[in-house]
Structures are given as C-alpha cells and as structure tokens.
Amino acid sequence: MPLASGLLTGKFNKDSSFAPDDHSNYNINGDAFDVGETFSGVNFNKALEAVDELKNILPEGITLSQLSLKWILMHDAVSIVIPGAKNKDHVSLNTSSSELDNISSLMNEINSVYTKYFFDDVHHRW
C-alpha cells in the first residue's frame, strides 16, 4: 500500500469520516487486519499529522502522491511500486513520480517524518 490507502494523497483530513461498514473506519486505529492493509497499519490521526508535515516540505509542482512514490523508489531495495489509481489522471500522476529528480535534497526531511510517525509502528513488520 504505497499510498497508505489514500492517506499519502492528501485527500483526507481531521474532518474525514467513514461509513460504519467501511473497512477504513474499522481500521482507523491501525491495529486491525494484516500488515500493509488499510492505512498501512498506522493510526489515522497520527498519519494525518505526518501528512501535514510532508505538505510543508512539498516542492511546488509536485503532489504529495508523487513525493511519496518517489521516496519509495529512491530506496535501493525497491525497483517498482504498484499504487492504486481510480482514473487515468491518477495513473499519469503516479507514473510521472519515477521521473522526478528534484527531491534528493528532501530525503533527510522525509526520512525524519517517517521515523517520527511511522517507524516504531510499522518498520519492524517489513
């Protein structure tokens, strides 16, 4: 789940809600399901804080989705990411992330956000 069920697209905020029968609502605390499922096993509200920090370092002209996917692709152990997409515009945006070359300078800041919000909760699972 490279975009953490949409969390790393920036489409959710603290006012977002889910239907009672929506699996997102069921796993809003990040403790249900198996590793890597809804919200990648991270508490929804905690992840929103991370998203806010990432938005603050987002370069002009780059979406949060693109930044997130490129960050994954910049790890030596990763050769491909398979994100979800609901339409052809999402596909185009997602594939264009591999062509970004101007985020190397942000890696330390992105890694810091990952460490602060996600590392303890999920890193040991991978």
Feature names for model-found ranges:
Residues M1-F12, W71, N87:
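Glycine-rich beta-alpha junction loops
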Residues S16, P20-N56, E60, M74-S79, ...:
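Terminal-tail/helix-coil boundary detector
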Residues L67:
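Glycine/threonine-rich phosphate-binding loop and adjacent beta-strand/alpha-helix elements that clamp
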